[in-house]
A protein has these predicted regions:
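Single conserved hydrophobic/aromatic residue that forms the stacking wall/gate
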Residues: 1-12
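Short, conserved active-site loop motifs that form the nucleotide-linked donor/cofactor pocket
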Residues: 8, 86, 118, 145, ...
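Non-transmembrane, aqueous-exposed alpha-helical and coiled segments at domain scale
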Residues: 14, 23-76, 80, 93-113, ...
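Gly-rich Lys/Arg/Thr-decorated short loops/hinges at beta-loop-alpha junctions or inter-strand turns
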Residues: 16-24, 48-53, 88-91, 113-114, ...
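Generic beta-strand/beta-sheet core signal
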Residues: 27-29, 53-54, 89-91, 121-123, ...
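Short acidic loop-to-helix transition motifs that present clustered carboxylates
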Residues: 32, 126-129, 218-222
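Active-site phosphate/pyrophosphate-binding segments
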Residues: 82, 95-195
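Generic long, charged, amphipathic alpha-helical segments
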Residues: 196, 201-223
Length: 223
């Protein structure tokens, strides 16, 4: 807060700043997903060699920018032959935040997918997310990238990567299960994102050794 009132005296934080220390300005700007995503889309269009990322506070909030997503991000290349490499980070998952703070509406984005118009991903490891962003800027062409990013994975003890996982390799569209002997596996489960860690925990707790769990990291184009 700029002005503190919950004390004996009101405190204005810049009252001790002298004239030769520069200017300090506070603006109560409009909270508009539509406006900011529109600006970032234009910025990405004007600077195709920059990695422009727009992150929603929660994935649900992207509905405030639906016009930009429907008319530009998903369709501009087909309609106007305009490529754009903007990245959308959409927090997604039932993680105790309540209504309108839980779902990035994965199904809506998949319904917009056609003719390789954009990338849609749901990464499960830090290194794979790194390589996905790296691939986005290293490609010789530009496509929008939609990434679902559960907040619970930020501090999950199992969601870690070794240094060599960042320095070596590339983005993996599919991650195989190396914890199960393929000769013993009787069932194969395909999943994506944070579901892997839920399934992995259950498998470990129940000591199941005949179920393999394969992660699909890129949802579109499907590997």
């Amino acid at each position: 807060h700029f002005v503190r009132r919950r004390q004996r005296q009101m405190c204005i934080r810049d009252s001790k700043i002298s004239d030769n220390q520069g200017k300090f300005r506070i603006y109560n700007s409009l909270l508009s997903e539509y406006g900011v995503l529109g600006f970032d889309y234009g910025y990405s269009m004007a600077t195709p060699n920059s990695l422009t990322i727009w992150e929603a506070q929660f994935g649900d909030f992207s509905n405030g920018a639906q016009i930009m997503i429907d008319q530009y991000i998903s369709a501009a290349e087909d309609k106007w032959k305009l490529q754009n490499g903007i990245v959308l980070l959409l927090p997604h998952g039932y993680e105790g935040q309540g209504a309108e703070h839980s779902s990035a509406r994965v199904e809506r984005y998949l319904q917009l997918c056609a003719k390789d118009n954009m990338f849609v991903a749901n990464c499960s490891t830090p290194s794979n997310l790194f390589h996905l962003l790296r691939r986005q800027i290293k490609l010789s062409y530009r496509k929008p990238l939609i990434i679902f990013t559960p907040k619970s994975l930020l501090r999950h003890p199992h969601v870690v990567s070794k240094v060599k996982d960042f320095t070596d390799g590339n983005f993996k569209m599919v991650i195989d299960d190396f914890n199960i002997d393929c000769k013993q596996a009787k069932k194969l489960v395909f999943c994506s994102g944070k579901f892997y860690y839920d399934l992995y925990t259950v498998r470990e707790n129940r000591k199941i050794d005949d179920v393999a769990i394969v992660r699909i990291e890129q949802l579109f184009p499907l590997p």
